[in-house]
Amino acid sequence: MKFGVIVFPGSNCDHDAYHVISKHVGQPVDFIWHRDTDLSSYDAVIIPGGFSYGDYLRAGALARFSPVMNSVKAFAASGNLVLGICNGFQILCEAGLLPGALIRNRDLHFVCDYVNVRVENTDTPFTHELKAGSALQMPIAHAEGNYVCDDATFAELQGQGRIIFRYCDRNGETTDAANPNGSRDNIAGICNRERNVLGLMPHPERACEDLLGSSDGRELFRSLAGTLAAAA
């Protein structure tokens, strides 16, 4: 199996994702420049966090027009796995690969902190090695992480089990106090209908080593690799 990490001007978590895949998952991984369009040699693509194009206009609004994104759409449509983290989640929403939008945080401040997220669904390629209902500790770092969607979209996400992560307290309770940005229903991550595209605002790639305060994100990447290994 082989992973690709897309790099936009302004990406700053690309090396973190690369490090996790190469060191903790133990699989080959390449950086993919945003002007490149050939994804044929990859089994999974990661769109990392950062500030693509300086977040001008709004987060992800310009990155969606990069040449690589048409290839990402085709890659996902073929059933391949796409993971968007933080700015990557924003880009996936802007590109129409995930519904809804991520707007300014409720308090209009950039938030950089550790949060807890509850695993809502383990029936996905990204979460099958996680425990449903468990609370994972991961860092966040964003100014536009407030997930919004209309009522019909929310009902669909809820009804189809596509809300994958919710912000919670350390006991797994989804309280308002545990919601760092005002996201609807404490939503921290969602997937598409086919469940092969996942976007989340917390940074699992920054929670893979105890030295950094948490290794709770490691199993997400191992789930992803396990899915690919089973399909090989």
Regions found by a protein language model. Give the residues of each.
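Beta-strand-turn-beta hairpins that frame and shape the catalytic cleft
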Residues: 1, 132-135, 192-197
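N-terminal beta1-alpha1 cap of cysteine-dependent amidohydrolase-like domains
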Residues: 1-85, 93-99, 105-111, 118, ...
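Active-site-proximal beta-strand elements of phosphoester/diester hydrolases
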Residues: 3-4, 137-141, 198-201
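Short, glycine-/Ser/Thr-/acidic-enriched flexible segments
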Residues: 10-11, 52, 145, 170, ...
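Structured helix-beta-strand junction loops
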Residues: 78-79, 159-161, 193
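N-terminal Rossmann-like NAD(P)+-binding domain of SDR-like oxidoreductases, especially those catalyzing
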Residues: 88
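Pocket-forming structural segment of enzyme catalytic cores
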Residues: 97-184
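A glycine-centered loop/beta-turn motif at secondary-structure junctions
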Residues: 187-211
